[in-house]
Amino acid sequence: EDGKNLKWQYQSAQGNTGTAAQIARKFVGDKSDVIVAIATPSAQAVVAATKDIPLVYSAVTDPVVAKLVPSMAPSGTTVTGVSDALELGKQIELIKRVAPAAKRVGIVYNPGEANSVVVVEQLRELLPKHGLSLVEAAAPRSVDVGSAARSLIGKADVFYTSTDNNVVSAYEALVKVGMDAKIPLVAADT
Protein backbone atom coordinates (compact mmCIF):
# COMPACT_ATOMS: atom_id res chain seq x y z
CA GLU A 1 0.00 0.00 0.00
CA ASP A 2 1.33 3.47 -0.89
CA GLY A 3 2.74 5.41 2.02
CA LYS A 4 3.38 2.31 4.16
CA ASN A 5 6.60 0.49 4.94
CA LEU A 6 8.81 3.44 4.10
CA LYS A 7 12.25 3.29 5.72
CA TRP A 8 14.55 6.29 5.76
CA GLN A 9 18.28 5.95 6.25
CA TYR A 10 20.22 9.14 6.82
CA GLN A 11 24.00 9.47 6.73
CA SER A 12 26.23 12.53 6.48
CA ALA A 13 29.68 12.47 4.92
CA GLN A 14 30.53 15.77 6.67
CA GLY A 15 32.17 16.97 3.44
CA ASN A 16 34.55 14.00 3.28
CA THR A 17 34.64 12.34 -0.16
CA GLY A 18 35.98 9.05 1.22
CA THR A 19 33.13 8.88 3.70
CA ALA A 20 30.67 9.77 0.92
CA ALA A 21 31.94 6.80 -1.10
CA GLN A 22 31.55 4.48 1.91
CA ILE A 23 28.00 5.70 2.51
CA ALA A 24 27.11 5.26 -1.17
CA ARG A 25 28.44 1.70 -1.16
CA LYS A 26 26.48 0.96 2.02
CA PHE A 27 23.23 2.24 0.52
CA VAL A 28 23.86 0.21 -2.64
CA GLY A 29 24.63 -2.87 -0.53
CA ASP A 30 21.40 -2.31 1.42
CA LYS A 31 19.58 -2.42 -1.94
CA SER A 32 17.95 0.97 -1.39
CA ASP A 33 15.04 1.73 -3.72
CA VAL A 34 16.25 5.30 -4.29
CA ILE A 35 19.18 7.36 -3.01
CA VAL A 36 18.95 11.09 -2.38
CA ALA A 37 22.34 12.81 -2.39
CA ILE A 38 22.82 16.37 -1.23
CA ALA A 39 25.89 18.10 -2.71
CA THR A 40 28.13 17.21 -5.62
CA PRO A 41 30.65 14.94 -3.84
CA SER A 42 27.86 12.77 -2.42
CA ALA A 43 26.07 12.56 -5.77
CA GLN A 44 29.32 11.68 -7.55
CA ALA A 45 29.93 8.92 -4.99
CA VAL A 46 26.50 7.42 -5.69
CA VAL A 47 26.98 7.57 -9.48
CA ALA A 48 30.32 5.78 -9.03
CA ALA A 49 28.71 3.12 -6.83
CA THR A 50 25.64 2.22 -8.91
CA LYS A 51 24.03 2.56 -12.31
CA ASP A 52 20.90 0.67 -11.24
CA ILE A 53 19.49 2.46 -8.19
CA PRO A 54 17.78 5.78 -8.95
CA LEU A 55 19.62 8.86 -7.69
CA VAL A 56 17.95 12.17 -6.91
CA TYR A 57 20.54 14.90 -6.29
CA SER A 58 20.26 18.43 -4.95
CA ALA A 59 22.76 21.19 -4.20
CA VAL A 60 24.68 20.44 -7.40
CA THR A 61 25.69 23.52 -9.40
CA ASP A 62 26.43 21.86 -12.74
CA PRO A 63 25.47 18.17 -12.96
CA VAL A 64 26.96 17.91 -16.47
CA VAL A 65 30.40 19.19 -15.41
CA ALA A 66 30.14 16.98 -12.31
CA LYS A 67 29.60 14.03 -14.69
CA LEU A 68 26.31 13.05 -13.09
CA VAL A 69 24.36 13.34 -16.36
CA PRO A 70 25.46 13.68 -19.99
CA SER A 71 23.31 16.79 -20.54
CA MET A 72 20.50 18.76 -18.93
CA ALA A 73 18.04 17.08 -21.31
CA PRO A 74 16.34 13.83 -20.27
CA SER A 75 19.08 11.24 -20.55
CA GLY A 76 17.44 7.89 -19.90
CA THR A 77 19.73 7.29 -16.92
CA THR A 78 18.63 6.67 -13.34
CA VAL A 79 19.95 10.09 -12.30
CA THR A 80 17.86 13.24 -11.85
CA GLY A 81 17.83 16.22 -9.55
CA VAL A 82 17.89 19.95 -8.98
CA SER A 83 20.70 22.38 -9.75
CA ASP A 84 21.59 25.15 -7.33
CA ALA A 85 23.39 27.20 -10.00
CA LEU A 86 23.94 30.78 -8.87
CA GLU A 87 22.85 33.89 -10.72
CA LEU A 88 26.34 35.35 -10.63
CA GLY A 89 25.32 38.62 -12.27
CA LYS A 90 23.04 39.38 -9.31
CA GLN A 91 25.70 38.19 -6.88
CA ILE A 92 28.19 40.63 -8.44
CA GLU A 93 25.65 43.45 -8.14
CA LEU A 94 25.34 42.60 -4.45
CA ILE A 95 29.12 42.60 -4.02
CA LYS A 96 29.25 46.10 -5.56
CA ARG A 97 26.49 47.30 -3.22
CA VAL A 98 28.08 45.81 -0.11
CA ALA A 99 31.61 46.98 -0.97
CA PRO A 100 31.33 49.79 -3.56
CA ALA A 101 35.04 50.71 -3.35
CA ALA A 102 36.18 47.10 -3.83
CA LYS A 103 38.26 46.22 -6.86
CA ARG A 104 39.51 42.75 -5.87
CA VAL A 105 37.15 39.90 -4.96
CA GLY A 106 38.70 37.12 -2.92
CA ILE A 107 37.35 33.59 -3.10
CA VAL A 108 38.35 30.54 -1.10
CA TYR A 109 37.42 27.31 -2.85
CA ASN A 110 38.25 23.66 -3.31
CA PRO A 111 39.86 23.23 -6.76
CA GLY A 112 38.90 19.56 -6.62
CA GLU A 113 35.17 20.26 -6.41
CA ALA A 114 33.40 20.58 -9.76
CA ASN A 115 30.82 23.07 -8.44
CA SER A 116 33.49 25.42 -7.21
CA VAL A 117 35.59 25.24 -10.35
CA VAL A 118 32.55 26.13 -12.49
CA VAL A 119 31.80 29.19 -10.35
CA VAL A 120 35.44 30.35 -10.29
CA GLU A 121 35.71 30.03 -14.07
CA GLN A 122 32.52 32.05 -14.51
CA LEU A 123 33.74 34.70 -12.06
CA ARG A 124 37.06 35.00 -13.93
CA GLU A 125 35.04 35.89 -17.00
CA LEU A 126 32.32 38.06 -15.41
CA LEU A 127 34.13 40.15 -12.79
CA PRO A 128 36.33 42.13 -15.24
CA LYS A 129 33.16 43.20 -17.06
CA HIS A 130 32.15 44.88 -13.79
CA GLY A 131 35.54 46.48 -13.11
CA LEU A 132 36.54 43.79 -10.61
CA SER A 133 39.26 41.16 -10.49
CA LEU A 134 39.30 37.75 -8.83
CA VAL A 135 41.88 36.69 -6.26
CA GLU A 136 41.80 32.96 -5.53
CA ALA A 137 42.94 30.83 -2.60
CA ALA A 138 42.72 27.05 -2.65
CA ALA A 139 41.29 25.08 0.26
CA PRO A 140 41.35 21.41 -0.75
CA ARG A 141 40.13 20.42 2.75
CA SER A 142 37.82 22.10 5.24
CA VAL A 143 40.73 22.59 7.65
CA ASP A 144 42.46 24.70 4.96
CA VAL A 145 39.72 27.35 4.78
CA GLY A 146 41.08 29.62 7.52
CA SER A 147 44.66 29.68 6.23
CA ALA A 148 43.44 30.15 2.65
CA ALA A 149 41.34 33.13 3.76
CA ARG A 150 44.29 34.60 5.69
CA SER A 151 46.40 34.36 2.52
CA LEU A 152 43.95 36.81 0.89
CA ILE A 153 44.46 39.55 3.49
CA GLY A 154 45.91 42.57 1.68
CA LYS A 155 45.05 41.03 -1.68
CA ALA A 156 41.23 41.08 -1.55
CA ASP A 157 38.89 43.97 -0.78
CA VAL A 158 35.85 41.75 -0.29
CA PHE A 159 35.34 38.01 0.21
CA TYR A 160 32.79 36.09 -1.82
CA THR A 161 31.73 32.53 -1.10
CA SER A 162 29.86 30.25 -3.43
CA THR A 163 28.38 26.85 -2.68
CA ASP A 164 31.74 25.17 -2.07
CA ASN A 165 31.19 22.32 0.37
CA ASN A 166 34.55 22.73 2.14
CA VAL A 167 34.02 26.44 2.67
CA VAL A 168 30.44 26.00 3.84
CA SER A 169 31.47 23.33 6.35
CA ALA A 170 34.23 25.58 7.75
CA TYR A 171 32.36 28.86 7.37
CA GLU A 172 33.21 30.11 10.85
CA ALA A 173 36.91 30.20 9.95
CA LEU A 174 36.25 32.38 6.90
CA VAL A 175 33.94 34.69 8.84
CA LYS A 176 36.54 35.10 11.60
CA VAL A 177 39.26 36.08 9.12
CA GLY A 178 36.90 38.55 7.45
CA MET A 179 35.86 40.11 10.74
CA ASP A 180 39.41 40.28 12.13
CA ALA A 181 40.75 41.84 8.90
CA LYS A 182 37.65 44.01 8.36
CA ILE A 183 37.03 42.44 4.95
CA PRO A 184 33.33 42.35 4.00
CA LEU A 185 31.91 38.95 3.14
CA VAL A 186 29.19 38.27 0.58
CA ALA A 187 27.84 34.73 0.76
CA ALA A 188 25.87 32.80 -1.83
CA ASP A 189 25.24 29.99 0.65
CA THR A 190 25.56 29.52 4.38
Functional labels for PLM-detected ranges:
Residues 1-190:
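Short hydrophobic alpha-helices and adjacent helix-cap/hinge residues
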